[in-house]
Amino acid sequence: MSLKELEKKTKWIITKKKGAKGPDGKIKVISMGRLKTGKERLALYIPASSNVNAFLSMVDKVLVEAGIIEDTGEILLKLTATDSQEGYTVTKQKTGGITISIMRIANKLGLKRGITEKEHEIDLRNKTVYILFPNPNDS
């Protein structure tokens, strides 16, 4: 089943609104915590070798949707290229990787630092990247 099909089974909790190198070339959660402003922060690291990196390097901002797949408890993130003010900024790192700092999302999803993606898929026509993370409770 493709990740795009999984989208239909996902109960979206967060919908569109306002570092460390992974040796395996996978997308990884690298940092999270509260900023001084009280906002939560979750930074994704997307390695330079990743095809997602190649796609996102052409994009300045992404809308982020995130949800939990009801059957498995896995977490699906959907990043869609946008010009909107509400998008999150895509930051290119010196290492060639890319990070996206996503506010207010970390704790609602139960994502923890160090979690590595299970798989990802790019839908070029809709300028969207799907990233599937394992169920954080299956450790």
Please provide the spans of the model-predicted regions.
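Long, compositionally biased stretches
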Residues: 1-40, 57-99, 113-139
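Short, well-ordered beta-strand segments enriched in hydrophobic/aromatic residues
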Residues: 42-49
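Short, structured coil/loop segments at alpha-helix boundaries
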Residues: 49, 69, 107-113
